[in-house]
Swiss-Prot record:
Matches recorded under PANTHER family: SEMENOGELIN-2, SEMENOGELIN/SEMINAL VESICLE SECRETORY PROTEIN
Similarity annotation: Belongs to the semenogelin family.
Record-level GO cellular component terms: extracellular exosome
Intracellular or extracellular location(s): Secreted
Bias-annotated ranges (Basic and acidic residues): 292-310, 336-345, 465-492, 499-522
Source organism superkingdom: Eukaryota
Function according to Swiss-Prot or TrEMBL: Participates in the formation of a gel matrix (sperm coagulum) entrapping the accessory gland secretions and ejaculated spermatozoa.
Signal peptide start and end residues: 1-23
Any Pfam family the entry gives: Semenogelin
Listed name of the protein: Semenogelin-2
The keyword Signal is annotated on this UniProt entry: yes
Record field: compositional bias (Polar residues): 31-40, 137-158, 325-335, 379-397, 427-436, 446-464
Amino acid sequence: MKSIILFVLSLLLILEKQAAVMGQKCGSKGQLPSGSSQFPRGQKGQHYSGQKDEQHTKSKGSFSIQHTYHVDINDHDRTQKSQQYDLNAQHKMTKSKQHLGGSQELLNYKQEGRDHDKSKDHFHMIVIHHKGGQAHRGTQNPSQDQGNSPSGKGISSQYSNTEKRLWVHGLTKEQASASGAQKGRTQGGSQSSYVLQTEELVANKQQRETQNSPQNKGHYQNVVEMREEHSSKLQTSLHPAYQDRLQHGPKDIFTTQDELLVYNKNQHQTKNLNQDQEHGQKTHKISYQSSRTEERQLNRGEKSVQKDVSKGGISIQTEEKIHGKSQNQVTIHSQGQEHGHKENKMSYQSSSTEERHLNCGEKGIHKGVSKGSISIQTEEQIHGKSQNQVRIPSQAQEHGHKENKMSYQSSSTEERRLNYGGKSMQKDVSQSSTSFHTEKLVEGKSQIQTPNPNQDQWSVQNAKGKSDQSAGREQDLLSHEQKGRHQQESSEARNIVITEHEVAYDDHLTQQYNEDRNPVST
């Protein structure tokens, strides 16, 4: 035990003598123990206040002596390094001249004589040391940090431009706030530093979203601008917060990029989600329409199709895909309950819109898409689609009946335009009449529609009225209350479809669609 104690005392004496010699010569380069990476304030205060008593210095101030002359060593080494960087050396001199009062407060107001000069160098070198960007390594050899910190080569090539610009542009502003930052750090520790670091990251994200620069180069330029504007806040994060930012900075940067991409990609989804209130059902609509938009751009890259995408139109696709897709849409959405009925309406209108573009790509048909008109199709597609539309929505309940009515009216509209396509038939569409059909189409469709819609009384009446082939009997069935009900419910269904279809793509077309709520003939 005695030998261990003597050995420890001898080491302390040797270290103290070496530190004194190195301090007088203004230091030669050398490595320091691992504890020198941080600067405990309390031990420094004890050391400087107890210099008059030699025993007190040996017992309690030995560890802080290392820190004291660590500052001198850094001063000497960084002075040699700053000879290669004249601009940085000039800023060092101006800093030591401008902040004499702040340097005195840093060492707890207890230095006298030559201690003021050491305190100035100490305060100055702490700022430059952490500006170099090597604090996150827990440095033990100052010579290694000096080779990296002035030139910005230590961390990565991404931070080099930032460090150099901060020394050139933002150093004078950072000097004004450095004394207050060091003073607050001695009392409150590193808590305020981390808080201000968070403000820095938030400010960087906000400015980055404003400028819309998803590249790393633009991000670091924004960092430089934010530091120049808010140097009083950023200076407090030099010692612990800057260390943490160097360790976790790239992660935050890439996270910001991902958020920007999501925001730019789902900009319309964000608007629509803020307006929706019904259990995320309309969210499914928006995502469904986004996938449909990708398919549109994949199939057609023309300018006219792009305009139709912004207006809620669906681009041209092959007949087989449209036929299969309409079956899947009606089958899936018809199984849902109250909230799924609106989805069925919207998806049905989208599929019918695709068929419009498929058969007629003219400008007149594009106008008809926004007004709810149905284009010409082949007889086989009409029969196949009417089968799916009538059979499957009949399984739905109260809300499904309106869907059945709308799909029924739309399919009959397609047959009208198939056979005639004139303006008089469009007027008949708005009046919900089911006359003027050929015998073959009427008979074929009545055979398909009659078996399944028997669950609904209103559908049975429509099926019987259509199978009778006489326009007079159909008008009698749709007259009085049923005719008014048919017109009202079918127009409401179309209005709901058009409105929801419009919200999912572009909120600016609301006025245009509200003016065209009722079916307009082309």
